[in-house]
């Protein structure tokens, strides 16, 4: 079988030489060579010598009706066997179908679930949309061309194909970089993120990503580089093979802006994320060390920390490795073609990296979305047929280990004994407040704050903190737990366990659950479904303790009074909240919409917990002081040090940008008839530090962060 000779345009045939006349010399020679070869083929066909000949067509063509195979820049013609076309085409088709399906599921879940519309998730949705459009515009054309072993469309279609691939490829890379930067800031600078990150700003950042990607996808359409066929001649990309200075400059810029810089940023961000998780943030570490009891630093906590570090390292390694494996081959091939090693860039070497690059659309929805519990729950809810394909959540299995961090605090407070309204009763001479926040946010985004209050009440007389125990006295432990689920349901539970005390110490047989306060009471959000109540409803703890202890001692309950310190990071949506009378009102002065960290100090002088006060009352400095003074007058309570303890309430009401954020509430109460200002300050400092620690933990270990 005789092979028809093929022809190849000279390497500089595309160069425009303005100094020559109508046709440059090189172009004239090329046309002459083509004419001679065509004539030779025609003579063989006319003479019958061409029967059974295998045609090796012109390489690199994109014209309609042409049959395109491969060639390298050295003029060597590659006869690509049909099997190679079918293998590559099938691989790209499978990759494209999986990528389109996975990213479509992510986008659909985002549209149907309002709980997913957080600023951080916008980047993930943008990535899914970009990958989906990449597969939609490139995969079908590539698969059909591979089936016919040639480019079936026009030159203009080749340019559009290359433009779509360039635009959405650049957008995906830039979005991956933005996600790594967002996670870096959330982990290392959480309070900065709280102040500056809003939905509007994230949307603006995404718009900039589109514009930036468009800036580098358009130039080849206007003469700076070009979109030409690549590999087996069944796809198109920017021209990195032509030895032209302007083309080389464009390739260099693309290499640095779309590979080198994003890759470097991702490595830097994930390295610092791992370092922060390993060593702990300076502020968080200092706060925990100051308020943590030595007994808390046990092996279990160290084991959780070790698992967190391993998990973070694995995720960082996977993300960086997948990015490098997807885009490094393409970057290497384009660099070889640009640096003058065109003879090494074969059609096979061009096609394989392109296939790797398209595979990024498959793993992105898995790494950044499907592994996140909120997305899985949304998929199970809105696409039930896929429930069996998704891994079970940790709440369902109860066996998987979830990354946890704990911040625990213990503080002993010595309080001043003061006369009370009932002459036969006395206040406690010593009390201990312990707060344990075990992980802040679980994989189901259930926020739990466990508060344990140990109060020692003496039956008669007022003794010092170190006084010997008296017969009939007791120690009560109140355990309160709050769970806030993504659906908006709030579950509160508070149990009182009283242990009688003998002259020789505590009884070995505590009375189990002498009183149960709001046991497992599920409070449906009075607000719009999906919203978490603001502020969080909680069961009054202090007053029931006093009533319970007084009942045990056969004494009338003292008037509830004391100090309550609250640290809140709350969820609001569209800046609206539901008040207690079920009337929808605009939240006035709701400072948490700007994600600023606020502390509120209020005097707890009634049985109604401060958390039930309306936000506009709770976060107003003047209103809080006024309420405190009124409470003091009502209960004949006058302490000059009290005003000193509530001199500031951070409102930060200048930036009231709407947003939707998770809520974490840490609350404890130090009960005393006349709390000295030093006790008040200790309580406030503990709550503030614990709030900061809990907030950082919840941000650091939320699945959107890693």
Swiss-Prot record:
Transmembrane segments: 87-107, 122-142, 160-180, 202-222, 249-269, 315-335, 352-372
Paired cysteines (S-S): 158-236
GO biological process: G protein-coupled receptor signaling pathway; phototransduction; visual perception
Gene3D superfamilies in the cross-refs: Rhodopsin 7-helix transmembrane proteins (1.20.1070.10)
GO molecular function ontology, one term from the record: G protein-coupled photoreceptor activity
Composition skew (Basic and acidic residues), residue ranges: 571-593
Residue ranges of the region described as Disordered: 393-446, 571-599, 630-658
Keyword Disulfide bond included in the entry's annotation: yes
Keyword Cytoplasm: no
Protein name from the UniProt record: Melanopsin
Organism: Branchiostoma belcheri
